[in-house]
Each structure stands twice: as C-alpha cells, then as structure tokens.
Amino acid sequence: MSNEIVAKRYAVALFQIAKEKHVLEMFEEELGLVQSVFMKNEELHSFLTKPNISKEQKKMFLSNVFSSVSESILNTLYILVDNKRIEILPAIANEYVTLANEERNVADATVYSTRLLSEEEKLNIAEAFAKRTGKDAIRVKNIVDEDLLGGIKVRIGNRIYDGSLQGKLARIQRELMKNR
C-alpha cells in the first residue's frame, strides 16, 4: 500500500478521535509541532529510522522529546515506530489539517508578495477569498517572494490566483498574440 494511502488512514483515525474528544485544534497544533521538529531535525529522523536501535529505545526517546503532546498523538507516534512508518508523519499531519479544515469549512492560503503584508491586508485577502471560495474563513500565511515584481499570488489548495505583475503581463501578451 502506498505511503499516501497509509498516511490518510492514520490521519482519518486521529481526526475521528479528535472529533469525539472535541480537540480538533489541539491535535492540529500538536501535529504541527511534531511535524516541525521532525522536519527540522535530521538527526531525529535518522535516529528513528535506524534499524539497529530497538523500538523501545525509540519510543522512550519520543516520550521524552514530545512529553507535552497528548496521549493520542504520542500513541500514534509509537504505532508508527512499531510499524516502521515514522517517515510518513509529515504526510499524516498534512492530511489531518486538510480533514480538520474541511470539517470547519476553512481553507489555508499561501500568499506570495514582494513584502510582508500587514494584518489588515491579510484580513482583507482572507475575506475576499473566503467569499470567492465559499469558505467560512481563510487562514493566510504570507511568504515574501523576491522574484515577484509586484502584486500577489494566492495559493489555496491546488488553485493559484495570480494577481502578480508578471501574471498580468503574461495575460496581456497572450491577448496580443491571440489578436494578431
């Protein structure tokens, strides 16, 4: 079975537990924390995937490193160690966020701009795209892209809304070429 399918199954199980316990946000934050530590620390990843280190040692290590996370998240990490699938943790976290967002009718947007946006600008973008996408809310993450000449690009899921200067120039060029 592919890692993507397996990650989705783990995420669905965690999502169902979180929904039953009314802790969707808490699990999302904890998974984000675990994912962040896992992605930034190559030594942790290396340690957890070494075959010569016992599962018990790995679990003890995880319980020390992630002592602040809930029992359900920690147990999931233990199961991943037992099943030698710890490398799919980032995919599980991403899939969980997708499920939680669907439940709350929220979307995550990545906004690429030439400078950091103010909170008011982020709020305006969130409101405009919430209406456009039919979502109750949009959570905006701003990334400064030095390659942009001006304007913004907004990525929500698989969709990109290009309001950048390059995008506008490309559209004008296509129109001019089409009308020749």
UniProtKB/Swiss-Prot annotation:
Question: Known SUPFAM superfamilies for this protein?
Answer: N-terminal domain of the delta subunit of the F1F0-ATP synthase
Q: How does it sit in the membrane?
A: Peripheral membrane protein
Gene3D superfamilies associated with the record: N-terminal domain of the delta subunit of the F1F0-ATP synthase
State its location(s).
Answer: Cell membrane
**Keywords of this protein's UniProt record, alphabetized?**
ATP synthesis, Cell membrane, CF(1), Hydrogen ion transport, Ion transport, Membrane, Transport
GO cellular component terms, alphabetically, are: plasma membrane; proton-transporting ATP synthase complex
Give one GO term, molecular function aspect: proton-transporting ATP synthase activity, rotational mechanism
Family according to the record: Belongs to the ATPase delta chain family.
The entry describes its oligomerization and partners as: F-type ATPases have 2 components, F(1) - the catalytic core - and F(0) - the membrane proton channel. F(1) has five subunits: alpha(3), beta(3), gamma(1), delta(1), epsilon(1). F(0) has three main subunits: a(1), b(2) and c(10-14). The alpha and beta chains form an alternating ring which encloses part of the gamma chain. F(1) is attached to F(0) by a central stalk formed by the gamma and epsilon chains, while a peripheral stalk is formed by the delta and b chains.
Q: What does this protein do?
A: F(1)F(0) ATP synthase produces ATP from ADP in the presence of a proton or sodium gradient. F-type ATPases consist of two structural domains, F(1) containing the extramembraneous catalytic core and F(0) containing the membrane proton channel, linked together by a central stalk and a peripheral stalk. During catalysis, ATP synthesis in the catalytic domain of F(1) is coupled via a rotary mechanism of the central stalk subunits to proton translocation.
Q: State the name under which the record lists this protein.
A: ATP synthase subunit delta
Which source organism does the UniProt entry give? Bacillus cytotoxicus (strain DSM 22905 / CIP 110041 / 391-98 / NVH 391-98)
